[in-house]
Amino acid sequence: MSTFRDDIIRFLTDEGFIPGRDGLWPQVLSVAEPQRLILPVEICATSPQEAEAQARDTERIVLEIKEKTGQMPLIMTEDRWLRQTGMMKARLLAHLGRHMQVYARNCEVRRIEKGVAAEFLGRCHSYGDAACRYRYGMFLKRHTGHLAAEGMGQALEAGTLVAVATFSNARKWVKGDKVIRSYEWTRYASLPELRVSGGMGKLLRAFIEEAEPDDIMSYADLEWSEGAVYEQLGFAGEADKEAVMFRVDPRTWERVPLRAGAREEEGTIPGTGRNLFFMNFGSRKYRLKLTEYPSE
């Protein structure tokens, strides 16, 4: 029987890469050129307890890899691969250096409608759309970048929507003698086959110019990133958010959070008689303070 891991190996081989089994971690795939480690994570747990044990084992492997190689492996989960196949394949190739490159200076930012943002995020963000107040799109004005590898097809046309960022409405609270307006950066995504150099920063500046926030917070999904890009933008890490337990529908591979304190049977998928569970790796909270105010 073909496995999820076999599917990744077959895809990489068809794309001209030579994936092999890593000598230290049998679960991990190694690609020599460029040197990258890929960690496939199957969705096979039939109870929350089993999913938690699997998550702890995955975290252990990731930590060992980081300690020995200084490299964060690319984590590929089975549900994402099967539910968002095109996006995940493009992301995988991009991490291996096969992507198109454009520069934010050759793009313009403008507000976009709810439907446009939702459609783009549905295709390009792991968690799709989310409730928000502000929606911005980055559109290509002219393409003066390059293809990072051959075989990427035609350059994008002027006017192409290449990235989207969304922000919440303001939350207000009193800090000392100031009323602070704090916003959440809820989503950012670019076309998965694309690298937009300076894209996040340009979208952030557009929001700051319009909303004039005192404070912006966001979360880095530790399944994908440890948040270095937020630090480059001036955000400071605050705390890690606990991992979330999901049930996964094996027919559609959709994740649904299992609410805290729920009984295991409440995660049952109607008509299947089978439960699958996955525990993610949590997230890291970041904050950008644009107005000085006391922390307490």
Predicted regions and their residues:
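A conserved beta-strand-loop-helix scaffold within acyl/acetyltransferase catalytic domains
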Residues: 87-91, 96-214, 220-228, 232-233, ...
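Active-site/acyl-donor-binding loops of N-acyltransferases
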Residues: 219-293
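Acidic-basic catalytic patches of nuclease active cores, encompassing PD-(D/E)XK
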Residues: 1-22
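Short beta-strand-loop-alpha-helix junction that forms the active-site gateway
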Residues: 33-58, 170-171
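Catalytic cores of nucleic-acid endonucleases
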Residues: 51-83
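Hydrophobic beta-strand scaffold residues
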Residues: 19, 72-74, 237
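A short catalytic or substrate-binding loop motif that flags glycine-/basic-rich loops and adjacent residues
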Residues: 21-23, 128-132, 277-281
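Active-site beta-strand-loop-beta-strand hairpin of nuclease catalytic cores
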Residues: 27-37, 181-183
